[in-house]
Curated annotation (Swiss-Prot):
Gene Ontology MF terms in the entry: homoserine O-acetyltransferase activity
GO biological process, one term: methionine biosynthetic process
Subunit structure: Homodimer.
Record localization: Cytoplasm
Protein name: Homoserine O-acetyltransferase
Ranges where the AB hydrolase-1 domain occurs: 54-359
Amino acid sequence: MEAIVQAPTPEGVGIVRTQRMHWTTPLTLTSGATLGPITLAYETYGELAPDRSNAILILHALSGDAHAAGFHSPTDRKPGWWDAMIGPGRPFDTNRYFVICSNVIGGCRGSTGPSSPHPSDGRPYGSRFPLITIEDMVHAQQRLIDALGIDTLLAVAGGSMGGFQALAWTVEYPQRVRGAILLATSARSSPQTVAWNYIGRRAIMADPRWRGGDYYDSDAPRDGLAVARMLGHITYLCEEKLEQRFGRRVDGDALDLGPRFAIEHYLEHQAARFNDRFDANSYLVITRAMDNWDLTARYGSLTAAFDLTRARFLALAYSSDWLYPPAETYQMAAAAQAAGRSFTTHLITTDAGHDAFLTDVAAQSELIRDFLNRLMTE
């Protein structure tokens, strides 16, 4: 296969811009409802090979977006959410691969979601936005891949909800995906995960400022979204990391009901940051899509689902991940192997919890690099 080779640039992909693709033709959703027109925000890194064989689609988790790598301006304080993994010489090597990342439908970072204008009146969808599924997200992404002129993806890759999408790609479009990289993910949302998500949604809907989802002309339900984010953020860590990072350090009056412990201040900080960049209705819509994710229920058995796939799989599990624990990765491996599929699993020992797929770069880099190398040389 032919790939573009460029001179190395150790500083990463540099300054990038978010692009948008628009479609006037409505998307028919799993529910039978339609959504349209549709906009997808996306970014690309590297160059597409002349034979279009080197494209990799990166799929983000709940709070992610299209900005996976690089900076939007020289004054940006932080790069994209997976910058350490994408760039020249990095696992998703932009000297070799054409890397794409898009914001999911239902989101609030440039793609069509509840805060987008409704085509009938130009006002935000709000409560009128339809419920979507992980498969709906993938069907929208398929339009983007078509528009970019790509027939077959070298790989799809994602962690957490991004892993849901990667799996869905291999089932929905088996002839268009050669490899799938699954990190800290599962073939279904467990009852525990559904419970955490429900409590978060309940907090948002109990905020008087939610107003049934139609709050865009007034104050947003910041208190409810803050509680949802705090709860969710705890599930991304683990007890060992919390003890190591915060212990029982205090900064405040023991008789005050406000934040006193270091962990409380940390959660308040995370909630405030999240409120500044995320929409409460998007949180509701996306977490419900996550709850409904279940390949076994959709296809009768997990083995039957994998029987539909043609891709090679690399799955990374993380020892301290209690949101999508390693046992769920092993269940996928058993089902895939029963279906005769190539499914390689690695357990990474870490104290970073579920967030390890974002932070434990060194531990996972060579595994991903080697997997992609094999795909390119087959």
